[in-house]
Amino acid sequence: SDPGDSVRAGQHEDINLITLLMGASAEGLEVLNKQGEWVGITAIPGSLVVNVGDMLQRLTNGYLKSTTHRVVNPPKEKWSEPRYSIPFFLHPVGKMPLNALAQCISDTRPRAFDDITAGDYLNERLVEIGLKKN
């Protein structure tokens, strides 16, 4: 059937520190660039794609931005082909503070996020997106 404008995974940022992506079996991964345009990403064979997650964004006080990404459907001629991807989500231990690193705070870049532990932040976000009840 025709998937129309549907996407395989809607626009989002990962909650964790970083996500490592080994080469997917088919195209479809797109990232949102600074100009607000979706750009297709294909891993170079033998390499990884690294997505910055929300936790790393907090630690760096926004110096490193979470990667906004999605997975779109392939062109019509490839609809019947499966797409496999092996993401590795790196999460810190729950008690790790996600406080902004001192070297990432300045007079021109004040603290952007409240202090919180990784576990509390993960729980907060999972409740926020409806994957966990409070």
Report the location of each language-model feature:
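C-terminal flanking tails of non-heme Fe-dependent oxygenases
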Residues: 1-134
